[in-house]
Amino acid sequence: MMSNLKLGVEVISARLKPREDYGGVNAYVELRFDDQKVITMTKIDDSSPVWNEKFFFNISDTEDLSNQFLDAYVYNKTSSITKSCLGKIRILGTAFLPYSEAVGLPYPLEKEKWSMFSSAAANGGELALKVFLTDNPSPKVPNLISTKKIPSKSRHKFHNIPTNESNHSPRGNQQSFQPQPPPPQSQTALPPPMMESSLYQAPRFGTPIPTTMGFNPNPPDYSIKETKPILGGGKRARSSDHDLVEPMEFLFIKIVKARNLPSMDLTGSLDPYIEVKLGNYTGKTKHFEKNQNPVWNEVFAFSKSNQQSNVLEVIVMDKDMVKDDFVGLIRFDLNQIPTRVAPDSPLAPEWYRVNNEKGGEIMLAVWFGTQADEAFSDATYSDALNAVNKSSLRSKVYHSPRLWYLRVNVIEAQDLVIVPDRTRLPNPYVKIRLNNQVVRTKPSHSLNPRWNEEFTLVAAEPFEDLIISIEDRVAPNREETLGEVHIPIGTIDKRIDDNRTVPNRWFSLKTENQRRVRFATTRLHLNVCLEGGYHVLDESTYYSSDFRPSMKELLSHKQPSFGVLELGILRIEGLNLSQEGKKETVDAYCVAKYGTKWVRTRTVTNCLNPRFNEQYTWEVYEPATVITIGVFDNNQINSGNGNKGDGKIGKIRVRISTLEAGRIYSHSYPLLVLRPSGLKKMGELHLAIRFSCSSMFQMLMQYWKPLLPKMHYARPLKVVQQEILRQHAVNLVAARLSRAEPPLRKEVVEYISDSNSHLWSMRKSRANLFRLSSVFSGLLGTGEWFQDICRWKKPVETTAIHIIFLVLVCSPEMILPVMSLCLFMLGVWNYRLRPRQPPHMDTRLSFADNIHPEELNEEFDTFPFSSQDPGIVKMRYERLRSIASRAQTVVGDIAGQGERVQALLSWRDPRATSIFMVLCLVSTVVLYVVPFKVFVLLAGLYIMRPPRFRGKTPPGPINFFRRLPAKTDCML
């Protein structure tokens, strides 16, 4: 008897990669379960189809449900009678969940059949399904097409059930059903179902991680958009250094100093400060104690767009314990204030008499100007007059310290003295310290130990001392210092290339109290040098902004600049709340980094649509570099935040080589942040970018030069060592920039430098796997196209290929010219399809738009020690083992194919080797007798022979190759 339990499948959407020979994708999905089959409607010419169709299957045996499975095939309808499989997925019956726990998930499509010589391969992509069990489907379950053979000729119709009421059936005679409202879904769901084609495994340990993310068929708009701002005030010619931003007018008032202010207290003293008042905005200078001639040198800037009064008041106040006393004031009519236009000279301050009977004068200057004014960067802005830490609001320019690689070769030590036990054999090792970097040699059991170990550290100018000490391990947890030496790095030799040899040096060690070691002098033999021929990497090599060496002599002579990069940071629109959700507004500022120059815009407080309109320039030395712009939420404005870091709102990268010289790129870039809750769009950053080339020839010649300095190729660093040194370099840069005023905080430097790019991420692994498949998709597509040529599926095209083949065989000298001409014509053809805007972060390429919460939870987990429950960590380990087992199988198959090639002449299979040797001897005679052109012609015609001359079984050479032995049978 058939049970009332039904299997529901909702086909949501897909993301497909079309084959080049088919052009667009006419996709539909075929579902198979328990000898039943249904198909969706066909989406014409759509690589991202959305169906939202729901189907229900009868379950014949509920007790055997765990042994059943659901197959979903995605087909491309190439014509009215032909189709091609784009991929399939299989979901096991053990993964079927109740409707209240089911969630829509994207499943990666896999090949229908895999073989080294098979052409049936999936092109990649994903299919989003929601699979659930229910005993009360909304409509009556339609008749399903059975996969078993039915003797009668009657046709069975089935009905697809759209999830939207506005969707209609794709077939005219079908009946559309109106589903009843389903029961409310729970906010907590289990991890994704176990399946053969997915990387997920259902957790069997611990508490499942809540999942609130489903597959969103209509994701937010993450694309880059072109904008048309009024740059430079609408002037076409370059009239100033701020022609990439929109002009913003400010009222500037510079308070310089005062003299002969009257005394207010009974003691005859005065604690003066000045209030600058414009409407409801009031700015205050710092106060001086008992000073009637104070010097302030402070600048206030009031936005003209927020002007609330026509009178500016400058009030002199006396700070008191109970209530501040009024000293005097000066009033200015805004209609009489002059306007200064850069690059005019600064307005000279003047003495103004305070409106007070007792006298007193203030030197100040008042004028209208724009953000191009020199006083703009040092001003206190009207939107942040009440901030406690006003220094963190200003725009500043920083420069990274010059970094060097410090190479230390610890050779040997002599005359170690053990005090007080001189008879004990020591267990010494050398410890090297520089900043926060500590390295150690291996222990050596001798009074005259020899190590001969080399270490590389990162040093930053201005240099700190290098501390080298010899430690004696007297117990497992006890060490004694036998002596140490402080080496000023400024006295160390510098090396430009590998041709120069740095001499070794002996250093005398001292004890902690700076006395010579008793009874003898302990000496340490070292080879220390500063490597000036390297570029110290403090960014990822994939999007680095500088590749120049550390030595200044190499900077100026061998790599001059050939262009200028100009960046205009206009504004941000639609900022969301901070990541904690505790702040109602955002105090946003931007940081841009290119080369060694960092720039920081002013902080616009309490604004969700801040306008910056600040412009900066950099010299360009290498086209294959990237400028990084990050947006942050300033949490240092008011006191009480402690060590709370600035919030990350998003960042973008622009590669210089993708920019056309002389063109202004004005676009709005989405600010994307990946959080444990998923991908979030924080707003849109509006930028204007222009790359100006001063020497086109020099820039083109730069493409032929090595990307890194010579020392990186003469004495290359290991990949692991280079990554460790990069982390030290980022820490050094962050430590130095955090000492500036205002400081550029450590979390900002790490976020811009992407210091965590080396950490494990399942999302990045999947993305890189699909990137790899996309790279080889063209090669696989060419192979499939050639197989279609050989099978004569397109007779006209096959005939044309035969003619071209005959021409090239008869005139082999035309092969290389024709290939070069084809590549040239392909480039000309693709010119009309060239990108019109700079590349931006692709959420689909990054697999960030539809990622499972468990993967995000793992990506944001702490390292190297996890903060998750041991059961979850064990589940992740089991999942990683499952992935590694698949990789292990693929690597083993590839190795087996190579071992079969080696087995041709290894005599592991005597008969196979004998056959191959006979074939080689026969082919030698044939190739000697038959002309080469004739041989190539016959071989090509044989390979492209018509189907009637082909068999249905693989050819003999492939059968022979598959029988060759591999070393798989020797594996344990």
Curated annotation (Swiss-Prot):
GO cellular component annotations of the record: membrane; vesicle
Family according to the record: Belongs to the MCTP family.
Chain ranges passing through the membrane: 803-823, 924-944
Residues binding Ca(2+) 1: 265, 271, 318, 320
Underlying gene: MCTP8
Role played: May function as a signaling molecule by regulating the trafficking of other regulators.
Needed cofactors: Ca(2+)
Protein name according to UniProt: Multiple C2 domain and transmembrane region protein 8
Start-end of Pro residues biased regions: 179-194
